[in-house]
């Protein structure tokens, strides 16, 4: 007996390892290296294509709670992340090359996982299968899925540029974490005064963008979690100053004042020789990226080792298609996992892979599938993507808004987060004891 897993991204890797850890053989299909998508840069598995940040570590935060739940479910990728984390204040950021290498080595060294490096164009019939083909599902498989379900939605994600550390002019920058969190040098901050910001802003909104297929270049449909900086800027001159360039919590030690606007740079790898432009996912043409981003004083001589790109993203109308256990409503041997289900974010995708893998095993063993309690973050996201009352389905990442309200809701935001997390982890522990 074996279970098929299609795709070796974050969700597929988690699903495969959950299945193998239960003693069931896995046939894992991955089209790389024979075929790649526009956003992929390597032949490795679990490739992080948008950012190297896995979001907040604090268990009292929604993102931190999600990761703690994953740890308690024996997450393979959380172990990989912990082994290659880089300083990032209160966030868990990783060296993405090492992260993908660890994931790839773990998968390929597992005796129960047989990897087939080939493109899948049709989902195997009469076999238990987890489809984790991702937001960059190949066109033949995407078309097969569309024919199977009659509808799907598409939009675009964007990735931020990366510059070399040595090309950052520290005469115009300073090291600090917002509100003095972390070790103090986790971020390089590139301040701008009002005049510099206005010059940059006007250049940004008028810069030429790369062409997109099946999408309006001037106003593409994008999701908030990875919105191109030029699209965000179109909303108004102050939008960036209240978004990725917000100066709050930062004081320029050279002036003693808070800057008008700040671009933060975060370490891309453990070596600290590359930095990514935080929140600056973009679809500008490469020469335009060089021209516009070099208007930021600290980046006037920046060496761009990778320019930002924008790529297609496809997801299901999951409330009409999936159950909360990630199985298809009319086919309990077929599961979907990852961003194709409408969960938004790296760890959210990985978490859905954990659940799909567990439930695929339970079907193989003749057991009933499980859904975690809806007061856990993973359980709440599982409920969200399968909520048939949702009329216009949009992707969702971890946030406390998807959880049931607290009985005694603290007024203080931090206390409220701690209460949500304490309740969730207690609920998860109790649930896991009974299965």
Region annotations inferred by a language model:
Residues 17-79, 374-385:
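N-terminal FAD cofactor-binding segment of flavoenzymes
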Residues 47-57, 82-98:
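Dinucleotide-binding Rossmann-like beta1-alpha1 core, especially the glycine-rich loop
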Residues 96-115:
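Helical element adjacent to the flavin cofactor pocket in flavoenzyme catalytic cores
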Residues 109-266, 271-286, 290-291:
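Predominantly flavin-linked oxidoreductase catalytic cores and closely associated redox partners
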Residues 349-370:
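Internal hydrophobic alpha-helix adjacent to the cofactor/substrate pocket in enzyme cavities
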Residues 393-435:
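C-terminal auxiliary extensions adjacent to catalytic cores
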């Amino acid at each position: 007996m074996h279970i098929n897993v299609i795709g070796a991204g974050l969700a597929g890797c988690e699903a495969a390892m959950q299945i193998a850890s239960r003693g069931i053989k896995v046939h894992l299909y991955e089209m790389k290296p024979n075929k790649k998508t526009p956003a992929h840069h390597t032949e490795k598995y679990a490739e992080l294509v948008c950012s190297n940040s896995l979001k907040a570590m604090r268990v009292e935060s929604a993102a931190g709670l999600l990761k703690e739940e994953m740890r308690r479910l024996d997450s393979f990728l959380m172990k990989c992340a912990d082994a290659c984390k880089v300083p990032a204040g209160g966030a868990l950021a990783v060296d993405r090359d090492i992260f993908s290498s660890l994931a790839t080595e773990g998968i390929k060294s597992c005796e129960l996982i047989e990897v087939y490096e080939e493109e899948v164009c049709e989902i195997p019939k009469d076999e238990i299968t987890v489809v984790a083909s991702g937001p960059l599902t190949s066109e033949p498989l995407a078309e097969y899925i569309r024919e199977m379900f009659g509808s799907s939605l598409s939009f675009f994600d964007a990735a931020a540029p990366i510059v070399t550390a040595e090309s950052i002019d520290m005469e115009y920058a300073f090291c600090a974490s917002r509100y003095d969190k972390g070790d103090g040098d986790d971020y390089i901050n590139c301040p701008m005064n009002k005049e510099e910001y206005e010059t940059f802003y006007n250049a940004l909104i008028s810069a030429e963008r790369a062409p997109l297929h099946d999408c309006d270049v001037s106003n593409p449909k994008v999701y908030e979690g990875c919105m191109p900086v030029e699209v965000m800027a179109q909303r108004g001159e102050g939008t960036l100053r209240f978004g990725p360039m917000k100066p709050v919590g930062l004081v320029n030690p050279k002036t003693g004042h808070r800057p008008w606007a700040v671009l933060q740079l975060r370490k891309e790898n453990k070596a600290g020789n590359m930095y990514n432009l935080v929140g600056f996912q973009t679809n500008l043409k490469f020469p335009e990226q060089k021209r516009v981003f070099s208007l930021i004083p600290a980046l006037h001589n920046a060496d761009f080792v990778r320019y930002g790109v924008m790529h297609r993203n496809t997801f299901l109308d999951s409330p009409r298609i999936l159950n909360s256990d990630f199985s298809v409503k009319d086919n309990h041997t077929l599961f979907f996992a990852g961003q194709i289900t409408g969960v938004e974010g790296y760890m959210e995708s990985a978490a859905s892979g954990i659940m799909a893998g567990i439930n695929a095993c339970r079907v193989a063993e003749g057991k009933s599938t499980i859904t975690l309690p809806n007061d856990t973050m993973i359980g709440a996201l599982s409920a969200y993507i399968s909520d048939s009352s949702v009329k216009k389905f949009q992707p969702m990442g971890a946030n406390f808004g998807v959880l049931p309200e607290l009985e005694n809701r603290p007024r203080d935001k931090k206390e409220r987060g701690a209460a949500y997390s304490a309740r969730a982890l207690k609920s998860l522990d109790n649930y896991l004891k009974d299965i």
